[in-house]
């Protein structure tokens, strides 16, 4: 037993853990080259070819949006121009390094929250999770977002407002979903005296909801919050204005507006997909698409008020709810909340049996969805109804998992000092 503990201790040392994780991901990248050249099913993500083509257009002095289906900020194509000048593997190795940087940030955040002894273990859960390993090595850019989101949490937790706000503005520019974190971040800054002192306690005890709401608005106008919102807003606005100046309306349309009206009728776990598919030619389809955001907004608002004191947990719930109830839900979106899961796990008071059952349920629900999706994609059979039913089951299981996590989580609101 002691020998096994010694082996685990060695394994969890950073000088062993990080090089091993890098080696495994690099091996997957090289295997991907072999598979792409020799097998019918390709390893490299289709989006990676889109990124590379967009980067090539940039090197020719034209817009990256000349590449059909490029729906991202030009900044990503700029970052990947070494794909053209150096090697096509550059982007994959960059995403692999972002995976490792995300793990490092997970470790730092956990240590700052007072979880020193087991921080390396939870860090390893991300490093050796096969899903992020495969996603980054296939050339998907989600690990970049993971680094940005974790960096925001790291700096906000340490009350480094300027750095946190700059990265937050950049993260919203890269992908719009982190904008949902603004309310819990604002409430987190006021967590020590959110309801006030004695007056606040009297308000709560008397259930004066109007006064609570007024108090909330007053505290949301504090110096720290206004500074964070201003810096992040200016960062986002400057990036947006710069790229709008360079690429015009097609930048706004492809980077932001497209995602408000997007419909993915095949590779989509969303419970809304079948409704949006059937009403695609309806005059009210745009309104229905916008209405799909309403349940998300309500749930995110409630979660913000309930769990803002534990910011990583609140952001995890935000992201899990956003992805589960989104009108478009693909497997790469799962990484948006999986990168936050190691920050939540130390507070879970759940039996191992229960945890394993939830993991099995999560994978089982995806397998159920993949069967009709395969017959639709590769056999050309009409399985839309079955895919929708599987999507409803996936939503149900995700909801059960979220409820179980909330029920078995012990809130952590460790006070952090300004630095």
Curated annotation (Swiss-Prot):
Its EC number is 2.4.1.-. Keywords: Endoplasmic reticulum, Glycosyltransferase, GPI-anchor biosynthesis, Membrane, Transferase, Transmembrane, Transmembrane helix. One of its GO terms (biological process) is GPI anchor biosynthetic process. One of its GO terms (cellular component) is glycosylphosphatidylinositol-mannosyltransferase I complex. It is found in: Endoplasmic reticulum membrane. Residues 1-13, 112-114, 190-224, 307-327, 377-382 are cytoplasmic. Pathway: Glycolipid biosynthesis; glycosylphosphatidylinositol-anchor biosynthesis. Residues 35-88, 136-168, 246-285, 349-355, 404-419 are lumenal. Belongs to the PIGM family. Part of the glycosylphosphatidylinositol-mannosyltransferase I complex that is composed of PIGM and PIGX. This is GPI alpha-1,4-mannosyltransferase I, catalytic subunit. It comes from Xenopus tropicalis. The lineage of its organism: Eukaryota, Metazoa, Chordata, Craniata, Vertebrata.
């Amino acid at each position: 037993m002691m020998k096994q503990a010694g082996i685990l201790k060695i394994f969890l040392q950073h000088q062993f853990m990080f090089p091993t994780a890098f080696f495994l991901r690099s091996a997957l990248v090289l295997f991907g080259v072999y598979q792409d050249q020799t097998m019918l099913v390709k390893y490299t993500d289709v989006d990676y070819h889109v990124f590379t083509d967009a980067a090539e257009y940039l090197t020719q002095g034209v817009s990256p949006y000349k590449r059909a289906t490029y729906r991202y900020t030009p900044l990503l194509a700029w970052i990947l121009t070494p794909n053209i000048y150096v090697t096509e593997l550059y982007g994959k190795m960059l995403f692999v390094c972002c995976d490792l940087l995300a793990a490092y940030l997970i470790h730092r955040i956990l240590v700052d929250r007072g979880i020193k002894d087991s921080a390396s273990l939870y860090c390893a859960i991300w490093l050796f999770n096969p899903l992020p390993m495969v996603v980054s090595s296939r050339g998907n850019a989600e690990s970049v977002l993971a680094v940005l989101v974790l960096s925001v949490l790291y700096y906000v937790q340490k009350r480094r407002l300027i750095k946190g706000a700059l990265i937050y503005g950049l993260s919203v520019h890269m992908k719009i979903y982190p904008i949902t974190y603004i309310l819990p971040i604002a409430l987190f800054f006021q967590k020590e005296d959110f309801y006030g002192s004695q007056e606040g306690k009297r308000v709560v005890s008397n259930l004066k909801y109007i006064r609570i709401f007024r108090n909330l608005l007053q505290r949301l106008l504090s110096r720290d919050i206004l500074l964070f919102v201003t810096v992040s807003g200016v960062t986002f606005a400057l990036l947006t204005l710069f790229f709008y100046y360079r690429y015009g309306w097609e930048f706004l349309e492809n980077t932001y507006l497209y995602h408000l009206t997007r419909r993915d009728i095949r590779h989509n776990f969303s419970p809304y997909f079948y409704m949006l598919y059937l009403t695609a030619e309806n005059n009210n389809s745009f309104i229905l698409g916008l209405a799909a955001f309403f349940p998300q907004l309500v749930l995110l608002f409630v979660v913000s008020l309930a769990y803002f004191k534990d910011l990583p947990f609140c952001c995890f719930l935000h992201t899990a709810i956003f992805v589960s109830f989104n009108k478009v839900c693909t497997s790469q979106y799962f990484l948006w909340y999986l990168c936050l899961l190691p920050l939540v796990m130390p507070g879970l008071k759940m039996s191992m049996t229960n945890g394993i059952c939830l993991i099995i349920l999560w994978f089982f629900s995806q397998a159920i969805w993949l069967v009709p999706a395969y017959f639709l994609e590769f056999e050309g059979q009409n399985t839309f109804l079955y895919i929708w039913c599987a999507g409803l089951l996936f939503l149900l299981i995700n909801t059960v998992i979220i409820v179980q996590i909330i029920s078995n989580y012990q809130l952590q609101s460790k006070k952090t000092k300004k630095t």
